[in-house]
Amino acid sequence: MHGDTRDQSTPVAHTVDPAVAESAGRMDSDTRTDPAMPSPRASGAVRTESSESQASTAQAPAAPPATDQPATAARQPGAEEDLTAAPRRRTTSTRRTTATAATRRAAEPGSAAADAEPPARKRAAGKSTTKTATAKTGTKTATKPSARKTTESDTVIGRIPVLDVSPQIDAGRRPAKAVVGETFLVTATVFREGHDAVNANVVLRDPRGRSGPWTPMRELAEGTDRWGAHITPTAPGRWSYLVEAWSDPIATWRRTAGVKLPAGIDTALVLEEGARLLEQAAAGVPKKEGRAHVLAAVDALRDPGLPPLSRLAAALAPEVLELLARYPLRELLSASRPLPLQVDRERALFGSWYEFFPRSEGAVVDPNGVEPPRSGTLRTAAERLPAIAAMDFDVVYLPPVHPIGRAFRKGPDNTLTAGPHDVGSPWAIGSPEGGHDAVHPDLGTIEDFDHFVAEARALHLEVALDFALQCSPDHPWVNKHPEWFSHRADGTIAYAENPPKKYQDIYPINFDQDMDGIVKETVRILRFWMSHGVRIFRVDNPHTKPVVFWEKVLSDIARTDPDVVFLAEAFTRPAMMHTLAKIGFHQSYTYFTWRNTKNELTEYLTELTGDAAAYMRPNFFANTPDILHAFLQQGGRAAFAIRAVLAATLSPSYGVYAGFELCENEPAHPGSEEYLHSEKYELRPRDWNRTDTLAPLLTVLNRLRRRHPALQQLRDLRFHPTDNDQVLAYSKNATTPEGLTDQVITVVNLDPHHVQEATVTLEGDGPHVVHDELTGAVYTWGRHNYVRLDPSAEPAHLLTVRRNPT
């Protein structure tokens, strides 16, 4: 957040609890607001709800002032206004009061009290005639987020409790995540004593601290006290959100009137109480928005010539209900403390990735082994880009392009002895020709790399570069920075091991001798490649480096280049994977490769699309140069098609490694997940003109993903019952820019060897006309639907449904 640059003009007089006013501090951010739209208004200063005992750090926005009693929160003359429509506050008495300087600070724009003040109902300074009850309280508010200490407001429940706000990452110490235009659900527990009605809304604050739009919440299930609303950030940056709750006197009156008037109980009194409430609310409805409708209802409630139920009906007219929903009358306003939200660009969530080794494109290999192989170059690799773009991929991902060490170089299939012409592993980085900021001479020059990036960009492809923070024994760092490596008892540098695997050609980094130096060098290298057009990095094995190291590196990059995306290749324990996501990685590899049965997929995707979706975004690679799963080895072409459909429709980001479309599935040996003739250790030119390619299927999947917003999001995934464990059915839903409901239903045969039949059960009413994007067939589907899927033909249905919103 930036320094306090708010309007310093004199605020309108108002009343606030003196104890609160004395301790109220200014939020350390630019909280000026847009004059276009007002924000919710309340009958009192907002109380911070902190009974969840959630610690706050410099990353979290400062909490608003807290008070037990209602207070007028006046807007400064000339200050910019909030972005949303403003609910009306209810006043309780009429005596002029004067604000203290501390009180004025508490009501500055950006404080919760100021955010609650509606610009549509401004009063001139010195003209206020309202009085509110006050009571002394020991509540304090820190002046800066970084200096915020635990106070009474951290432990005392507000007048209207607001508890368990979600999403909330590490008690608010880390931001929840979304991308521009992504809609997600905010929930909270809201209730009060007795039977009076409560209501709630979410306030979303943009990176400049402007509040709006506020979004009404609803009780998710009657009697649960759990409220929710969907919000959608519209620009990248660090946002925040909070939940406001209040006592709703008009809703309480409606409920009472609906019982008493038909029974003839207290008829005149009930009608007059309603008239007074609506009269107060009408003052908060702008004339141009329809204030006259509310005033007409007031007149009807007081019209003795009308029957009581007709007078009530006027107050319940649709236009009156709609206006008071937009401009509610709020009492006893309470609020959660603001929670941070990091909003990234779309590619952080959605994209189709294609990985290939540039040295194999244009390579020449003598099948008889007589002539030495000739490596492809970045220029010849660029010739492959049009075919990748034609399949509608979004990202082309390159393994390391740096010089490869010669010491302990690996031979074919990871053999320990390399021949004179063996090319080695690209992950054994560094030679006398250079390190992480150099291009392998066989691939060309940095100018050739720039050409590759430019060609990709012209085809609307982004380039992702592998970043592997490790060295070959020949890397310049070995001599320049020996303290960056671990040394064994005999003085030699320890090579990498992941028992039973040994990587004698790779030296891992030791971060504990000079972490600051390694951070500085890492940031320099990343910025070097960023200056050459790379805005996505796939980070190799980040789980083998300290989390705090990555936090330092990623925060440094995000400070100036928040559009740069980092994918964590972390096949590791859940705690590490989730923590890497929380500290700044935008995406993560997952266990998708090893989830193949109906139960495995359902359970795993339920986990990923649940609470974890607020901070961890999966990228489902169907294969990698390291992993050829037994399902692909044994299932043939149908298995590849099945896994492609699953990856492309379950996750908004997915990828394949070159050769997937050719169904390459020969393992190094039985039981191995390594490829025979692994491209990690040798050149592998391919015949892309083969007719048995899966490229047409990948193209259909990628085009479908681009056309359907439902497939571009993670959180709204629903599994549907089937009566066959070999048939998996699920759907995704989203709203299109045109306001239509976009739904994609996927039904997959998980058995690559046999035809499977099942009945798919869908919730809701039918029938609906659905279109199969794979075959072009059109079906009418209702609640129970028969399917028959032949893996040798089409192993899945990809059904699209479009309806007008209800």
Segments and roles (model prediction):
Residues N479, E483, H487, N510-L580:
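Active-site neighborhood of glycoside hydrolase catalytic domains
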Residues R347-G376, I404-F452, N479-D516, L676-R684:
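Aromatic- and acidic-residue-enriched carbohydrate-binding clefts of CAZyme catalytic domains
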Residues S472-E483, W550, A558-R559, F571-N599, ...:
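Substrate-binding cleft/loops of secretory-pathway carbohydrate-active enzymes
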Residues Y397-R406, F467-P476, D540-P546, E569-R573, ...:
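Short, solvent-exposed turn/loop segments enriched in Gly/Ser/Thr/Pro and often Arg
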Residues G376-A387, D514-W529, A639-A644:
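Short, acidic/polar
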Residues L554-E569, P574, N596-P670, T736:
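Catalytic-core region of carbohydrate-active enzymes that cleave or remodel glycosidic bonds
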Residues S352-Y354, V396-L398, V463-L465, F537, ...:
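Hydrophobic faces of well-ordered beta-strands that scaffold small-molecule active sites
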Residues M1-E52, S56, P61-A63, D68, ...:
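Carbohydrate-interacting/catalytic domains
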